[in-house]
Design a protein with these regions (language model features):
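Active/binding-pocket-proximal capping segment
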Residues: 34-38, 141, 193-196, 242, ...
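Conserved helicase motor core of SF1/SF2 NTP-dependent helicases
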Residues: 154-156, 163-175, 231-247, 251-516
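Acidic, low-complexity intrinsically disordered tails
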Residues: 1, 95-102, 106, 508-516
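Conserved ASCE P-loop ATPase motor domains encompassing nucleic-acid-directed helicases/translocases
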Residues: 1-85
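Flexible, glycine/threonine-enriched loop-and-boundary segments that flank and lead into catalytic domains
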Residues: 1-15, 19-28, 209-213, 229-230, ...
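Short flexible coil/turn linkers enriched for glycine and charged/polar residues
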Residues: 37, 127, 436-439
Length: 516
């Protein structure tokens, strides 16, 4: 039976398909439809619970991490046994944050060598070692990763792909397939799918219980590239199964998970950017456990040191004024736009012609995680932009459509209010987690909280530099921040809080102030 419930405004991170449990922890129902804006949820209830009417439910799905634990224990036992003194090991190089070790050639760039050529050369010459690659917003790290995977396949190597989620794995595999098709190359790809995921065109599917079959496909070369989560690669049967393993979004992939999967490969390539979103956390852990593999390698640096890995210094997304802010605040001034981006700009808006940063102060009080005053300001901004046009990096002039805008907010409660007002216009609204990897003509970041002391998750969340980076770097031409001016005057008690506040304050210093 399908039961419909209404719920009051609240932070909701559930999704369709999630299983719900009442306070006693027993299985109650599964979400079939969820409308966060209207506060309605439809749930499918089994016969045994057909007459049960709980007043509150929660979702908690525990995934066993035993294979990862066992892999790390095997690694630790070997480390305690011989200390890897004579062994060439990607796992040890990762843990020790060693420089990439090559068989023959130099790690430094050769004269006239492009970044892609260097990345491919170094990857093919790795001596059971690691190659970290940091790619800022719009730098093309997925495209580069696909180029490297194709080169590995051409060299006869067995290739694995892993990431924090099935979707990220699929995105990289899709890029490999698209490039291979354009080049006329035959690349066979497979994936160990999630539980309820349907088979995908052009991808050999394996279910979660078919890891052995998937690994056999690598051995007999019926599959050149295999994608799977850490649970696939951490299994003992996967040890030594691939010559090179790619970890995509390694800035969100914990060091512990990376060490667990490393025994599966000869060499390890880590693609990502620790300056964007951090690894998602679903529980309380000891301090330091959540550090990502790339963050560990960076060792406190904002950008990849030249002797530790590769830094992708060009963005193909951000117009010069937006890139200047992003580069200064997050990338040690090392990120630059390609020349074609100088022509990207908004036109025919009457107020926002050109490219750049815009600060929209909105006075309000007493709001913690949602602000109607900001919703109204965002609505006016959206209407102005939808009546304008923009010029892309190829000089093509076009009208700004709803799909050319993104509206970002830190809290789901504020997202719901914004969506209720903007859904009819077709403009996408969400948290930064939804939009990482996406791009648009202009982005609007609405911060919702009236005063720093009101922030529900404290300064670390509301002023997060990672989230500010992702939010403001979605827009090709322009980034708007809509917020209470009181957020510019937090009561900082630590150097870290001063650093967090500096991100927003620096944006405002470089931005044009506008009133709606």
């Amino acid at each position: 039976a399908i039961h419909r419930y209404r719920f009051p405004p609240q932070e909701v991170e559930l999704k369709e398909g999630d299983k719900l449990r009442p306070s006693d922890g027993s299985h109650f129902a599964q979400i079939k439809h969820l409308d966060r804006t209207a506060g309605i949820v439809d749930v499918k209830v089994g016969k045994a619970a057909a007459e049960y009417r709980p007043t509150a439910v929660f979702h908690c799905e525990v995934v066993s991490n035993v294979p990862l634990q066992e892999s790390i224990i095997r690694f630790a036992e070997r480390l305690l046994g011989d200390g890897f003194r004579d062994a060439r090991s990607a796992a040890w190089d990762l843990l020790a944050s060693n420089r990439p070790r090559l068989r023959s050639g130099p790690f430094a760039a050769r004269d006239g060598e492009s970044l892609a050529e260097r990345a491919i050369r170094v990857m093919l010459d790795l001596d059971h070692s690691i190659l970290p690659i940091q790619g800022p917003p719009g730098s093309g790290k997925t495209y580069l990763g696909a180029q490297m995977i194709r080169a590995a396949v051409r060299a006869g190597l067995r290739v694995g792909v892993t990431a924090q989620s099935h979707q990220v794995i699929q995105n990289l595999i899709d890029a490999v397939r698209e490039q291979a098709a354009e080049a006329g190359e035959a690349v066979s790809v497979g994936r160990v799918l999630s539980k309820d995921e349907p088979p995908l065109d052009g991808v050999t599917p394996f279910r979660s219980g078919e890891k052995g079959k998937a690994l056999d496909a690598l051995t007999d070369r019926s599959v050149h590239v295999l994608g799977g989560t850490a649970w696939v690669w951490a299994s003992e049967e996967a040890e030594g199964s691939v010559d090179v393993l790619f970890i995509d979004e390694a800035g969100q992939f914990s060091l512990g998970h990376a060490l667990a999967v490393a025994p599966a490969c000869g060499s390890l390539v880590l693609l990502g950017d620790p300056q964007q979103l951090e690894q998602p956390r679903k529980a309380t852990h000891p301090d330091g456990v959540g550090v990502s593999a790339l963050t560990h390698i960076l060792g406190g640096h904002e950008t990849m040191p030249d002797d530790r890995g590769l830094f992708m210094p060009e963005t193909r997304r951000l117009a010069p004024p937006v890139c200047e802010f992003t580069s200064e605040l997050f990338y040690d001034g090392r990120l630059a736009p390609i020349p074609a981006l100088a022509q990207q700009r908004i036109v025919d808006s009457g107020r926002f012609d050109g490219a750049g940063l815009y600060w929209v102060p909105v006075e309000h009080r007493g709001n913690r995680n949602a602000a109607d005053e900001e919703v109204e300001a965002v609505e006016r901004l959206v209407d102005t932009l939808l009546g304008a046009g923009w010029i892309d990096d190829r000089g093509r002039r076009r009208r700004i459509e709803p799909g050319d805008l993104r509206v970002v907010a830190p809290y789901n409660a504020h997202v719901n209010r914004l969506a209720a007002r903007l859904d009819a216009r077709g403009v996408q609204v969400g948290t930064v987690d939804r939009f990482q990897g996406q791009t648009c003509a202009a982005v609007i970041y609405s911060m919702a909280t009236s005063d720093p002391a009101d922030a529900p998750r404290g300064m670390d969340f509301l002023y997060s530099l990672n989230r500010l980076n992702v939010a403001t770097s979605r827009g090709r031409c322009a980034a708007f921040i809509v917020a209470s001016p009181a957020l510019l005057e937090p009561e900082c008690r630590t150097p870290r809080q001063m650093q967090l506040a500096n991100g927003l304050c620096r944006f405002v210093e470089k931005a044009i102030e506008v009133r709606t």
